[in-house]
Swiss-Prot record:
It comes from the Eukaryota. Belongs to the complex I subunit 3 family. The chain crosses the membrane at residues 9-29, 64-84, 88-108. The gene is ndhC. Signal peptide: none annotated. GO terms for biological process: photosynthesis, light reaction. Its main location: plastid. One of its GO terms (cellular component) is chloroplast thylakoid membrane. The keyword NAD applies. Gene3D superfamilies: NADH:ubiquinone/plastoquinone oxidoreductase, chain 3. It is a multi-pass membrane protein. This is NAD(P)H-quinone oxidoreductase subunit 3, chloroplastic. GO terms for molecular function: NADH dehydrogenase (ubiquinone) activity; quinone binding. NDH is composed of at least 16 different subunits, 5 of which are encoded in the nucleus.
């Protein structure tokens, strides 16, 4: 028999984690002052008047480097729970994690050879 009461803590945290940000945004919307003037609408740059254009173009190398970083950051998110419960899961999950890491290594070698990790 599948027992639903085991998930009560999960549902409580889920409801609370959805409710608190909604409540915070609602309260700040009611309490925030509404004064829109020319000074309020101007851009702020370290307390002085902005110099030059506000629009800046980044090079494509930055985006490639950031994308590779995000991929390996997500890898850490997936591997951390596996590492914490390694002794319980057994050898089959170890093989799956090994395949996952090997795919990521192949991807990093591919990105390296394509020059995505070079900044010059």
């Amino acid at each position: 028999m599948f027992l639903l009461y085991e998930y009560d803590i999960f549902w409580a945290f889920l409801i609370i984690s959805i409710f608190i940000p909604i409540l915070a945004f609602t309260i700040s919307g009611f309490l925030a002052p509404i004064n829109k003037g020319p000074e309020k609408l101007s851009s702020y740059e370290s307390g002085i008047e902005p110099m030059g254009d506000a629009w800046l173009q980044f090079q494509i190398r930055y985006y490639m480097f950031a994308l590779v970083f995000v991929v390996f950051d997500v890898e850490t998110v997936f591997l951390y729970p596996w590492a914490m419960s390694f002794d319980v899961l057994g050898i089959s999950v170890f093989i799956e994690a090994l395949i996952f890491v090997l795919i990521l290594i192949v991807g990093s070698v591919y990105a390296w050879r394509k020059g995505a990790l070079e900044w010059s």
